[in-house]
Amino acid sequence: MSSQPLNVNEDEIAKFEQVASQWWDLTGDFKPLHQINPLRVQFISQHIALQVEGIDSKNGFYDMQIIDVGCGGGILSESLAKLGANVTGIDMGTEPLNVAKLHALETGVSINYQKITAEEKALENPGTFDVVTCMEMLEHVPDPASVIQACSTLVKPGGLIFFSTLNKSIKSYLLAILAAEKLLKIVPDGTHDHDKFIRPSQLIGWAEEHGLKCIDASGIHYNPITGNHKLNDSLDVNYILCCRKL
């Protein structure tokens, strides 16, 4: 057994444990994740179709091995599994994983959920996955660079990794924390810590250090009135990356 401490923030885990029962409530605390999920799936699907030979998003992702790092209650994991992929979802939250497993049973979707860190999984299954997704997770761990390294280890050469997180900017504080948490109450107060947000240049730098090439960096714009999300060129607040393993 490794004596290295786990790359886990227990306070962050506890926050999501407390609200795990709401994960699949479309009007609850996780409503923003449900609203953003179609855009994430579209972004991932389009890049898989463009970058992976022999794959057409219209025909599904059958036989593809995808791992969803920090899967929580399984919103993205289920969407990818419904497209035909063989999906593994990993998280360190017991209750979110229990919710994810139960919901998968209810919907008849087959997903391999595991309570394990990205680093531990990388030691167990290096170079196993065609695609790795790591959505809205990096800002919740003590060492995001370690997670990026683990994701690079998990993916096959030529495979794709998708990251999404929040930029460490004044605008992200104003919109993601002051507006979304404290004024509009779109997400629970205390969900995010601006000090843990990550500048795109920093994330891309870590990715390159671990053998990844960023092939797309797009901003995600949220309209609080309509609840819709769309991609744009501004990385000021939410952003999503597609990287390829060299």
Swiss-Prot record:
Membrane-spanning intervals of the chain: none
Keyword terms: Methyltransferase, S-adenosyl-L-methionine, Transferase, Ubiquinone biosynthesis
Catalytic activity annotation: a 3-demethylubiquinol + S-adenosyl-L-methionine = a ubiquinol + S-adenosyl-L-homocysteine + H(+); a 3-(all-trans-polyprenyl)benzene-1,2-diol + S-adenosyl-L-methionine = a 2-methoxy-6-(all-trans-polyprenyl)phenol + S-adenosyl-L-homocysteine + H(+)
Top EC class of this enzyme: transferase
Entry's Gene Ontology BP terms: methylation
Keyword Nuclease in record: no
Gene3D superfamilies: Vaccinia Virus protein VP39
HAMAP family: UbiG (MF_00472)
Name by which UniProt lists this protein: Ubiquinone biosynthesis O-methyltransferase
Protein source organism: Colwellia psychrerythraea (strain 34H / ATCC BAA-681)
